[in-house]
Amino acid sequence: MITIKDLGFAYGEKAVLKNITMTLEEGRIYGLLGENGVGKTTLLTLLCGLKKPQAGTIDTDGMKPYDRQPSLLSNQYYLSDEVPAMNMKAAEYAKNYGKFWEGFDMDKFLEVMGVLENDPQQKMNQMSFGQLKKTYIAFALACNTKYLFMDEPTNGLDIPSKAQFRKAVTKYTREDSVILISTHQVRDLENIIDPIIILDRQDVLLNASLEEISEKLYFDYSADRIEGALYSEMIPGGNIQVCLNQNGEDSKVSIEALFNTVHQHKELIKGIFNK
């Protein structure tokens, strides 16, 4: 489990994160959403120890990530949005670098590469960006870490590859893992991320499971307009509208509509979910 308390970080005089408090529990795939520049990547790098908190604390199973303790380093993996094109075959990379993670499984790496339809014998510096990204995704999953942080993992992937990514993440991660995926392409991950974290500048607007969200908000997909809806958008065949769930009705959460609703009603949403 990761416990974040009053976390703060700034670049010079520009505060990016301020008083961030939340808990990330085991067995969850968290979606980290937010507009560009709100601190999603900064938060990921703080969680994996690449940056040191300037205020507050991060506790990962009783350890501080920035202390870079080997027992924690070998049990976490950070997949950056920018991945290096090494001058070696993908299989060689996995063999050479996998030894730094005690749970690394070469057979799993090759299996995930197969699921992603990627050639492990191809040199990484001859791959397209999408192929390179899939190589690092396969490596990340093969490390079998408890903590996995991914920054925009579907960037550069075509539509079939995005479906393969969803399949791989749901099939090849540990049951006790804590996975945090930063994305601005919510439709790519809509069926696998739960809970949802929405960051704003220096603040957390929402940190809730889909069950909690559907208990408090109702997502309507009919052609009829609803008076007083918090958010409304025309879609083929009608509208998608978000309202307060005053009647306890079940509905399917649209993460994209949720994101827009939260940004249009920041204080209202914080008040609803912080009760």
What are these regions (language model features)?
Residues 77-135:
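ABC-family P-loop ATPase nucleotide-binding domains
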Residues 33-35:
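The feature captures the beta-strand-to-loop junction immediately N-terminal to the Walker
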Residues 148-152:
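Catalytic Walker B motif of ABC-type/P-loop ATPase nucleotide-binding domains
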Residues 48:
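Helix-to-loop junction immediately C-terminal to a conserved catalytic motif
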